Amino acid sequence: MKELFATTARGFEELLKLELSSLGATECQVAQGGVHFMADDETQYRALLWSRLSSRILLPIVKTKIYSDLDLYSAVVRQNWLAYFDERVRFLVDFNGTNREIRHTQFGAMRVKDGIVDYFERNGKARPNVDKDYPDIRIHAYLNRDDLVLSLDLSGEALHLRGYREDSGAAPLRETLAAAIVLRSGWKQGTPLVDPMCGSGTLLIEAAQMEAKIAPQLHRMHWGFDFWRGHNQAAWEKVKREAVAMAEAEFNKNPNPHFYGFDLDHRVLQKAQRNAQNAGVAHLIKWKQGDVAALKNPTPEDKGTVICNPPYGERLGTTPALIALYSVFGQRLKEQFPGWNASIFSSEQGLLDCLRMRSHRQFKAKNGPLDCIQKNYQISDRTLSPENKSAVENAGEFKPNANVATDFANRLQKNIKKIEKWAKQEGIEAYRLYDADLPDYNLAVDHYGDHIVVQEYAAPKNIDENKARQRLLDAVTATLAVTGVETNKLILKVRQKQKGANQYEKLANKGEYFYVNEYGAKLWVNLTDYLDTGLFLDHRLTRRMVGQMAKGKDFLNLFAYTGSATVHAALGGAKSTTTVDMSNTYLNWAEQNLILNEADGKQHKLIQADCLQWLANCAQQFDLIFVDPPTFSNSKRMEDSWDVQRDHIKLMGNLKRILRPNGTIVFSNNKRGFKMDFEGLTRLGLKAEEISAKTLPLDFERNKQIHNCWIVEFV
């Protein structure tokens, strides 16, 4: 009997303990990341051949304390390595862990390697070679604080590499993880197993191999024990013969296929078919191309299990399509699989909530770096209503659940009815449909052509993060239902307070631009790459007013953003336009806006500069100035900080200097509670009239403080 250690992903230790016990292992003890056990030669080989959950099986050689790299080297060089392999082998050291003295795993691996080759030289042997790609022997070193364990890796390559998978889809599951998901799913062998989004088929193949009694490593050609001097060839051949005989006996039973894999991508299904063929279970699995929205139960007369690892995204921006996917998946499960069990694996608790099903059991697991959860469900066996039966028979496109977030959905529907008719009459294609009308749904919904943007406002600190997340997911589901927008044309963003220059930081790099019409102007928008879209919707009437005032005038647009006001001025007949902004990104955007509207002549100047510094040095005169500065800025690219309340009179003084006698300044900002310094204006010889109410469009009438706007002229 010898002591061995089987490694596994964290969270699977107890499951692995049960598996090893069933294979004949004794004295199984769970440890973090694996299981210690005792085994004779046959049980050792049986564990290597049959374990579906082990990542590696290690034979400990040295257990000792080390406090320095010299201790590490000494512990290695003293070991009788010739008892395990000879000098002709190619070997590799895998080193995991650190302590105070050995802080880098590469350094630790190098010291172990040095000790091994020096041992052979001291004993009159040639130095064995290191081979990082195809080693004959793997030495596994594990250091936890000062405790060192050196082991011989009997597996060779990691045991999740079964050998049947040629290639896979975009996000494959490790075979060991897939096996654990199957074992935890509650599926009973001999009953149907359906995977509606099967990808490369790993879940179904692992389950089919279990039922077919095919050892997961039956076809492995190379092992970590091949060059081990303790290898018992007779015991190994006996264990392998038993495995081959068992697989052949099950194959000859010729059971009817009851594993079913569906996927939308026919190319991935072809890979799944090849993988199943390689795994020896092609005769057990039926594959079919199909959309989850049209999923039908392939064996309605039987009861079985639906198992699935649906897509899940780390970035919030990928969520709308996933919300739709999980929502329709939940509907199809309840409609098509009454009385069945379901087991769904995902990294997103919120997405699982979109299934609208209550789980009776759940497990935590890791998929690479992602924290994931597996939830098991018992689908109700209640009789379907005639309406639901009809829906089952007429499966088709996704129809989001309109009964989610009903208060929000009703308000959104009411707003759409009012605003869309008005927008069409006005000739605008970008407008707001909802703006935090209800306190429980703290978000904005904007319409851009055939796209919808949902912007979540950052939740207050006293609001539970999970509750806020769930409300957002519910609101997106309701928005899909109410607007009928295609899922890939709904963009989701989290909006937070701007700090420094982060409004210029990219969220993505899709480069997807399209234009919207606004009172005859065509304006480029980008809904994905930046926090803002390139168009401030609340200033729509202000831009139109600027266009109406601009004919024959020299126009200045300061803090110009993407130059949309400049476009209106140019189309309104401005004699010249000057557009100034600190961001090259937005100036290039402004240039494209002008080109789109055939207003890109020499009279239209674009200047990249710190707006305040440029203004202080400007000698040109203007008839019409539009200035919409930030509320606050301390950007590193600006010489001084800026506060619109504190500094607006200084700004007006500089603007007065370049304003012609009959000129007009249109001044706007977004500071709530802004107070115009009328006394300061009087000292400058200027007067101001507030026109905020006149510049507030219908779609923003619920938010009267979104901006304030003023006409400033000479007294």
Curated annotation (Swiss-Prot):
Listed CDD domains: AdoMet_MTases, THUMP_AdoMetMT
Entry EC number(s): 2.1.1.173, 2.1.1.264
Catalytic reaction(s) noted: guanosine(2445) in 23S rRNA + S-adenosyl-L-methionine = N(2)-methylguanosine(2445) in 23S rRNA + S-adenosyl-L-homocysteine + H(+); guanosine(2069) in 23S rRNA + S-adenosyl-L-methionine = N(2)-methylguanosine(2069) in 23S rRNA + S-adenosyl-L-homocysteine + H(+)
Domain of life of the organism encoding this protein: Bacteria
Record-annotated THUMP domain positions: 43-154
Keyword Methyltransferase among record annotations: yes
Keywords for this protein: Cytoplasm, Methyltransferase, RNA-binding, rRNA processing, S-adenosyl-L-methionine, Transferase
Disulfide bonds: none
Top-level EC class: transferase
Pfam families, alphabetized: Methyltrans_SAM, RlmL_1st, THUMP, UPF0020
GO molecular function: 23S rRNA (guanine(2445)-N(2))-methyltransferase activity; RNA binding; rRNA (guanine-N7-)-methyltransferase activity
Compartment(s): Cytoplasm
Gene Ontology cellular component annotations, sorted alphabetically: cytoplasm
Biological role: Specifically methylates the guanine in position 2445 (m2G2445) and the guanine in position 2069 (m7G2069) of 23S rRNA.
Family: Belongs to the methyltransferase superfamily. RlmKL family.
Name of this chain's protein: Ribosomal RNA large subunit methyltransferase K/L
Species this protein is from: Mannheimia succiniciproducens (strain KCTC 0769BP / MBEL55E)
Chain's gene name: rlmL
